[in-house]
Amino acid sequence: MRSIEIPAGIVEYDETGSGPPVVLLHGLLMDHTVWDRVLPLLPSGLRIVRPVLPLGAHRRPMNPGADLTLAGQVSVVADFLEALDLDDVTLVHSDWGGALLLTARGLDRRVARQVFLPCEAFDNFPPGLPGTMVKLASRVPGGLRFAARQLRVGWLRGLPPLFGQMARRPVPDDLVRRWTDPLLGDPGVLRDLLAYCRGPFDGPSLIRDTEALSRFRGEALVLWSPDNRVMPAEHGHRLAALMPRARYAEVPGAYVLSMLDEPEAVARELGEFLT
């Protein structure tokens, strides 16, 4: 893993290939490995960058006092692109929708194209039943670590409040252990995740900030999974309608984590969009 320092702390990332930059984002309690099944299926001639955002599965805690609320996490993404001096970026969103707000904050100047897999949008922060579970767990002492331990038990992991509505296919044990080890082992990682989960999520403001994507003039692909129950199908269509140069497509048979459920379909759509 490589690493780079930004104002909030040190961000680790994986990078492969050379060419136009493509930045693959991930969701809460996950890291870059959520993309492992898609990565070898993508076209050559691309610089694929996969940051590990401070969303609970990161191995290096951020600086004490860093702003890791939703607003702060948006800045983390912008600062990461800045630190690597990435221009004409294709930014790929999945699950976590914070980076959708770059345009609203005037921080999207390095982003030329965007791809939206099922992700938080409008007032769906935190999203659905899994999001409600995380929010409640963050309010209870020891709650997030208890939830992480539940994720490590296969039959519990498949229940709707955990990963049952996130992935249609079982999420492998090795991935879940990797994602939960930092939270269970490092108080700094727990501190960072609590800072995010306990931060403000104002519905009307989030709707306005999502709708600011109407100002985004680059190409966009909304690659939604209509079978998922966490990110409403309506939101995918609304996102596509917002952006002047957006195209809508679907990945049938997948839930939120379509890159795990249907990696070939996701890679095919991404490849067509990127080349």
Can you annotate each of these PLM segments?
Residues 1-22, 43-46, 82, 86-87, ...:
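Alpha/beta-hydrolase fold catalytic core
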Residues 14-60:
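Conserved HGGG/HGGXW glycine-rich cap/lid loop of the alpha/beta-hydrolase fold
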Residues 25-27, 94, 224:
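The conserved beta1-alpha1 loop
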Residues 49-96, 268:
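Active-site loop/oxyanion-hole signature of alpha/beta-hydrolase fold enzymes
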Residues 87-128:
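Conserved hydrolase catalytic core segment
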Residues 126-181:
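Helix-rich cap/lid subdomain of alpha/beta-hydrolase
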Residues 187-238, 250:
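Conserved serine/cysteine hydrolase catalytic core
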Residues 254-263, 267:
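Catalytic histidine-centered segment of alpha/beta-hydrolase-like enzymes
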